[in-house]
Amino acid sequence: MQKGIKVNLALIIVFILSVLVLFINNLTTPRTLSNQELLVNGLFLFQEPKEISDFSFESSNKEIFTKNNLMGKWSVIYFGFSRCPDECPVAMYELSKLAKVLREKDFYMDDKQWILITIDPERDTPETIDKYAKGFDSEFIGLSSSRPMLLNLATQLAVNNSMPPMDNKEDNHEHLDDHVNNIILVNPKGEFVGFFRPPFDISRLSLTYQSVTQSD
């Protein structure tokens, strides 16, 4: 009789622990949002991903970055420039907070990368833009290239960068200030899947980013 009670008690304890584990897992596992929920929270996803043609950019230490570097990873891409007075540092700061929050949550990051592409290649050398990007997070990558290469990729990613090159005035960046401020999302197949729209908020960025990029 006493043995039966112990067995039943053990089964009850196992059941309670199982329920507790499932409850905690539901709390910690990011919820998969519908496309409408994603849109309400600032992430627009295309019905079908868009192909990206090959490109070639350069980071510091003459490291070449091509479409091949997008394969196998979720890539967040932002177009900005190191002398940007307002929008760029705000967006980059929010992305740095997002990366920090994800690490603190032990979110799987091995297949994630964060890229800043300069829209001012005449002044932002690969070393300059990479240093600027890493000023927000040491894992961020800064890239520069020729203006034709920049415009080709920017057009594919729906970023309006059809502006003339910088002139010789050191502090003149007015024609760059109206650039599209979206944050681009590229999937591990190297396809353009959508974009985050401003204003950027860490809670919404974290919610939508985790929903779309969480590993199985």
Please report, for each region that a protein language model flagged, where it lies by residue.
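N-terminal targeting signals for export/organelle localization
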Residues: M1-D54, S215-D216
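Short loop/turn microsegments at loop-to-beta-strand junctions
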Residues: I52-S53, W74-S75, V180-N182
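Short active-site neighborhood of thiol/selenol oxidoreductases, capturing the structured segment around
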Residues: F65-A91, L95
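Thiol-/selenol-based redox modules, centered on thioredoxin-like
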Residues: N168-D216
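Conserved helix-turn-beta segment immediately C-terminal to the redox Cys motif
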Residues: K73, A91-L116
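Thiol-based oxidoreductase modules, predominantly thioredoxin-like and allied folds used
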Residues: Y108-D124, E139-P148
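Hydrophobic alpha-helical segments, especially N-terminal targeting/anchoring helices
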Residues: E58-S59, V186
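Short, internal strand/loop/helix patches
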Residues: D130-V180
